[in-house]
Amino acid sequence: MFGNQAPQLFLKESFNSESKTMTTSTQQFDSKKVNVYGHITSLLFKFTTTITKGTGTINTSASVLDAFGQITIRDKNSRPVIDEDSSRFPITRKILSLADTPQWQTFKKGEYDAGSALTDTASAQVHSMEIPIDVNLEDQPISIEWVAGVLSDVLSTVGTASATCQLQVVVSSIVPVGESANLATRETRRIYSFTRGALATEQEIQGDLPTGITIDNVTLGVTTDSNLTDVTLKPTGKNIGLDRLDRTAIEAKENRAFFDGHTSGYHTLCIAPFVVGDSTVFKINPSTSFTPRLFIVHRGVR
């Protein structure tokens, strides 16, 4: 069906730290090895903060991210990874270090979720975001180090309040297959994601992607799939023959409940790669109304 050009996308939870108790002082790094191999397209971070108010007051101008301090991503032994293709300049993956409170708004639109303010409640408040990293790690695992913030970062009045925070990371990697595998590993691939309002009829999907790029696959993140059985995909207005959601792919996904808390979350549309020919990324015509989050894996140029 796909020929030799179709890559395979794998999504796996690779880092799930223990909860850290927030205190009134800065904590030391918590470092864990993340054994991830192959071509990483993105790291997807999930931040969870649980606050017990007591006599304290939650700072409603703060966000879940304020509970987290510095985050550093390193390769094995902190060595840079060099692109082995001698026909290009060597590409070194820089160490990503986000000092103090991460400022996600500096990332490209569609690659993060804007942090919402904390509410004055004792229930857990969760924020998820993506950091796109395009690098072929080959056999080099990466490690993630992070520190918890202090209580005053999320509380305007501490009192007897207590709080914990936890970091989870899902790694998305792409594994090319077939004759083009050797070349494909050196192409830039990124996950571009965005939320979309309810789709009831055929809708044009625009995600600010440039024309001329190749889209490898499209994944829909939905809260329920009880009625969602047929979706038509029409790049540049032409139906390319998508008939049904690939249920096999759904079962193959690991930790597919990571984003929305529902086991029906991921649906990878069974399509061949296609090129964006105009300002319309593609159109989706669902069989019934649903509200998706879209993940687009596309190729670009380094």
Each predicted region: which residue ranges?
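Beta-strand-centric surfaces of beta-sandwich/beta-rich domains
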Residues: 1-302
